[in-house]
């Protein structure tokens, strides 16, 4: 019985160890989904209008948010890395902005915490495709 419990514990923790070690080596979000024309246009609009996404490379919700855009559109976004050990980290800016969690969007000076659908972002920013 004890052997089965140990085996179960190892199996349950192994995926998280593998995932976190992969992320820690990269120290940046790796977006794999493909963008649509609409998501690229929205990302460009957000960037042109000063919308900022505060993020951390190790944050699963940040990755989920980025995957909604796809890799091509993600490159267009204004993203601030808040993790101290992240690539191009801007931790002090995140502290100054009082970022409490990730992802956080800054839209027209207002901070909005959480994953937002592309439709929600469009509505909040006045983007009309």
Show which residues each predicted segment covers:
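Structural microenvironment flanking redox-active thiols in thiol-disulfide oxidoreductases
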Residues: 84-93
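Solvent-exposed loop/turn segments at secondary-structure junctions
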Residues: 57-62, 83-85, 100-101, 111-113
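Local sequence-structure signature of Cys/Sec-based thiol-disulfide redox active-site neighborhoods
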Residues: 35-76
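Structural recognition of the beta-strand scaffold that forms the well-ordered cores
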Residues: 52-55, 78-80, 104-106, 111
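Non-catalytic, surface beta->alpha helical segment in thiol-disulfide oxidoreductase systems
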Residues: 106-129
């Amino acid at each position: 019985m004890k052997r089965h419990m140990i085996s179960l514990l190892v199996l349950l923790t192994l995926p998280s160890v593998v995932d976190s070690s992969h992320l820690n080596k990269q120290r940046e979000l790796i977006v794999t989904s493909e963008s649509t024309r609409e998501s690229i246009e929205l990302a460009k609009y957000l960037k042109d209008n000063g919308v900022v996404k505060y993020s951390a490379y190790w944050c699963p919700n940040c990755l989920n948010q980025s995957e909604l855009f796809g890799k091509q559109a993600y490159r267009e976004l204004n993203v601030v890395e808040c993790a101290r050990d992240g690539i191009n980290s801007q931790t002090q800016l995140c502290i100054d902005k009082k970022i409490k969690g990730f992802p956080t969007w800054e839209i027209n000076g207002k901070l909005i915490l959480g994953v937002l659908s592309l439709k929600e972002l469009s509505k909040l920013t006045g983007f009309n495709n």
